[in-house]
Each structure stands twice: as structure tokens, then as C-alpha cells.
């Protein structure tokens, strides 16, 4: 009854209203799938005991892949492994040969952290794990500066991302003072600003109202359409549907 009487008002304020249409940001055309940007070869991953063994996967430019499965199955651990932040127990994670750094191999786990910039980005389940600046605007500008933009150019990129994520008013705030949902939007904005070829995200839409959720989905779709391969751990079924994502079920021990 409340939703029937106040649905439009609640929706205008960003509330999730039952029956409200979910925007469609699925790809307009099938990806060519000429060559994967990231692959696994007989990958076994985990922290100590293996959570998954013998995994062979390919991830393509311009594609969104959803890692799904029950809690404890190892989705976040797999995400960290794919992002080059956790060493495989066995097997390999390999980036496309044309994307590897000069004088480096194809395995991201062997790279220096600065070599990941512009190649592989990671949005952590706990956003605070990636904050490195004292101010929100500076946080978003780190990636663009590291990619060669001047300070003015990096700030322009940061300002654009903050506006799109509805975070402009927090530009001079400390990232740790933001709410949980705001921190998550900041972490996504920071990674998108660096324009990586592969973006791994752990529960990117958690804690968002409908308005900020929709804007985040739009930005993720934009990165996909620009050729980024996006891999996301999520339980968000509307997100998967809105992006037309490929689904991979992660099940412990398989």
C-alpha cells in the first residue's frame, strides 16, 4: 500500500521500489572474441588449501563476466588471483602478449604494482583497502597521473568521475569519512579513471540506492563498450541482467 501511494516519490529519491524497471545496458552487439585478454591455464587457487583446481578460462575485451556462487566458495580469492594480487597454487594466469610490460612475462603475479596500472585494476570487497590519498579528488587522480596525465588533466578526469558517481561534494573530504556506499563508488571511480584493460570488481554495487546503482551500471557498461574486460564477483542479479553478463559458477573444490 505504501509503495502504491508513494512509489513515485520514493523512486525519485533513489529508493528501490518493487516492480520498477531495471535499465538495459546489455551489449548492443556480440563481442568478436578474436583473442582473450586474460586467460587461466590449469589454475588452482586458494589460500593454503585449494578452493578450485584445473581451471581453464578465457576473458575477452568488451565483455562482462559475473563470478557467482555461494559464500565461501572462493569467488573473492579467485578474483584476487585473476587480478595478479594472489599467487596461484598451481597453473597460471596469463595476460595477452600485447599487453604485458616490456621486459616482463605474461603472468601478472610477477609484475611490479606500477605495471598493473592501465592493464589490470581491482576494486576490493572492502574499499578502504585501496585508498592511498588524503582527499577524495586526489584518490581518483592517482591512476591518471600514473598513466602519464598532467596534474591538471588528472584532476579533470577525477572531477568527471566524481560527478558521474555523485561524489563531487566530497572532493576535499578524506576517503575514510565517507559512508560505505560512497566509499564503494569512490573505489570504482578510482579504478575506472585509470582505464585498465581488465577490471576485476568484488561486489561493486553493494550498498547503493537505485539512482547511484543505475549510474554505476552505466559507467561499467561504458568501460565494457570501450573494450575493457570486466570480471565481477556479485550476488546482484539485476546487475547481471542489466549488463547482459556471462555467468561463471564458482563452487568449492571444482
Question: What are the residue ranges of the model-derived segments?
Answer:
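Conserved ABC ATPase signature
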Residues: 174-178, 182
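The feature captures the beta-strand-to-loop junction immediately N-terminal to the Walker
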Residues: 68-70
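Catalytic Walker B motif of ABC-type/P-loop ATPase nucleotide-binding domains
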Residues: 199-202
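Helix-to-loop junction immediately C-terminal to a conserved catalytic motif
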Residues: 83
